[in-house]
């Protein structure tokens, strides 16, 4: 989700990035550009300027606390950033997106990587301490993917079916629970085999996003085997012929398959491909964020300013692509930097 001035929220859902009427965080990115138009302009990041080293001193401790999904990506950014500023010390703690808001509010981290939106209660806690909301900067695009074992012949799923597989509530409208592969139409050895469920725990932003958009805010079945990280989910599915799980697209391996998804039972399932995400056709595309404590009307200190400039530069977005995610584009990056108090590149 991306929140714009005036109460407009844009989020990936149901085959397009829909404007909603709930304002959570006043971020100016994309205030001028529609998301689909801005992203479609450039899916490679080549329009972004290269990073230019700052003329003044940039030093200190760069500590990031938050999303496990973004752990490797943040490490790539830190590695590239230190090539320009070797004296910078970095520390990365991937405890889950839920750990970012309190760490940022309490001042124990520099940035809070998150793979989900801030909850209203988290924003209120931050505002009660600082008097203004956190700034949330979109830094990459991810596709949340449903994985099955590489030998599984399943051709596609609707979100209604995903809900009936993972949720005990079936808020998405399915009339019956889905417990076996035969319930999805598979034959032969698969027909009677129970579906083994793998997922994340409640501290994970991926868990929260999947719960909201794939489970229609329903509750997970108690049979979901919670894993400590995104890669652990994929490894579990790779080791379980009858398993299914969800994780970010960047964790795809040769031992699992990404299942094409459809927003509705009437729609054709769409593979998790870049073109589909940029066009708004893949139903579980989402922004990844860096949250920062930025007092409105001020500029960030050199360390935070330059790290954001690096992340949203050609080099930083090349790291995004290297880690299996999709880059944001120049219009998105430029507006996000302005919103975060970075006056120029």
What annotation goes with each model-predicted range?
Residues 1-19:
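N-terminal secretory signal peptides that target proteins for export/translocation
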Residues 4-6, 20-21, 28, 54:
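Generic short amphipathic/hydrophobic targeting helices enriched at N-termini
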Residues 9-11, 33, 45:
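N-terminal compositionally biased, intrinsically disordered segments and leader/signal-like regions
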Residues 22-36:
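Bacterial N-terminal signal peptides
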Residues 40-345:
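Flexible loop/hinge segments at secondary-structure junctions
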């Amino acid at each position: 989700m991306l929140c714009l001035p005036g109460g407009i929220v844009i989020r990936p859902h149901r085959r397009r990035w829909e404007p909603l009427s709930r304002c959570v965080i006043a971020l100016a990115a994309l205030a001028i550009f529609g998301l689909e138009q801005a992203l479609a302009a450039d899916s490679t990041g080549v329009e972004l300027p290269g990073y230019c080293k700052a003329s003044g001193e940039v030093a200190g401790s760069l500590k990031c606390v938050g999303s496990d999904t973004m752990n490797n990506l943040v490490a790539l950014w830190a590695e590239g950033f230190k090539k320009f500023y070797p004296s910078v010390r970095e520390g990365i703690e991937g405890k889950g997106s839920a750990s970012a808001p309190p760490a940022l509010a309490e001042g124990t981290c520099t940035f809070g990587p998150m793979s989900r939106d801030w909850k209203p209660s988290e924003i209120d806690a931050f505002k009660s301490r600082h008097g203004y909301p956190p700034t949330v900067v979109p830094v990459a695009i991810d596709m949340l993917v449903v994985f099955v074992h590489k030998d599984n012949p399943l051709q596609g799923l609707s979100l209604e079916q995903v809900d009936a597989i993972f949720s005990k509530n079936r808020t998405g409208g399915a009339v019956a629970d889905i417990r076996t592969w035969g319930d999805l139409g598979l034959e032969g050895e698969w027909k009677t085999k129970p579906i083994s469920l793998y997922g994340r725990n409640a501290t994970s932003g991926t868990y929260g996003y999947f719960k909201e958009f794939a489970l229609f805010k329903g509750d997970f079945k108690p049979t979901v085997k919670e894993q400590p990280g995104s890669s652990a989910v994929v490894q579990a599915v790779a080791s379980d012929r009858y398993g299914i799980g969800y994780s970010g697209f960047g964790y795809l391996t040769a031992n699992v398959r990404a299942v094409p998804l459809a927003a509705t039972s009437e729609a054709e399932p769409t593979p998790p491909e870049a073109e589909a995400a940029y066009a708004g056709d893949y139903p579980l595309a989402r922004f990844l964020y860096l949250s920062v404590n930025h007092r409105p009307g001020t500029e960030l200190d050199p360390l935070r300013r330059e790290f954001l400039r690096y992340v949203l530069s050609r080099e930083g977005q090349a790291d995004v692509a290297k880690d299996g995610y999709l880059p944001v584009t120049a219009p998105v990056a430029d507006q996000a930097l302005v919103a975060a108090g970075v006056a120029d590149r």
